[in-house]
Amino acid sequence: MNTIHVDVVSAEESIFSGEARFVALPGEVGELGIYPRHTPLISRIKAGSVRIEKADGSEEFVFVAGGLLEVQPNCVTVLSDTAIRGKDLDEEKANAAKLAAEEAMKNAKTDIDLARATSELAVMAAQIAALRKYRQKK
């Protein structure tokens, strides 16, 4: 069977390391699908879910808050400041953080505050969408 080695790493820990048949993730300009022997590629990724179809046919979901992707013919590496396993996502916390970001946008006094709040809101919205996608696949 043709597989590709996949590593998903956050600033704190290795989230996933193993063999996969396919990886789908949110590239900066659209969804990327990676199969074994893919052409080498380096790209930024945006907040969203990484779907890994493991060698045994099961799926692993990981939320990433953006980061970098490196693809080699036999290896995929995803580097993200924040990465959370699908099973560890907490909808209540994500919704609370989304509301806090919306409030911060309303109360922003500078362009920097507004940009920070807007970025946080986008990440929380992506996290909630990733959680819903994970639950649908379960």
Curated annotation (Swiss-Prot):
CDD domains: F1-ATPase_delta. It comes from the Bacteria. Its main location: membrane. Keywords: ATP synthesis, Cell inner membrane, Cell membrane, CF(1), Hydrogen ion transport, Ion transport, Membrane, Transport. One of its GO terms (molecular function) is ATP binding. GO terms for cellular component: plasma membrane; proton-transporting ATP synthase complex. It is found in: Cell inner membrane. InterPro entries: ATP_F1_dsu/esu_C_sf, ATP_synth_F1_dsu/esu, ATP_synth_F1_dsu/esu_N, ATP_synth_F1_esu_C, ATPsynth_dsu/esu_N. It is a peripheral membrane protein. Coiled coil: none annotated. NCBIfam families: ATP_synt_epsi (TIGR01216), PRK00571.1-4 (NF001847). Produces ATP from ADP in the presence of a proton gradient across the membrane. F-type ATPases have 2 components, CF(1) - the catalytic core - and CF(0) - the membrane proton channel. CF(1) has five subunits: alpha(3), beta(3), gamma(1), delta(1), epsilon(1). CF(0) has three main subunits: a, b and c. Belongs to the ATPase epsilon chain family. This is ATP synthase epsilon chain. The lineage of its organism: Bacteria, Pseudomonadati, Pseudomonadota, Betaproteobacteria, Burkholderiales.
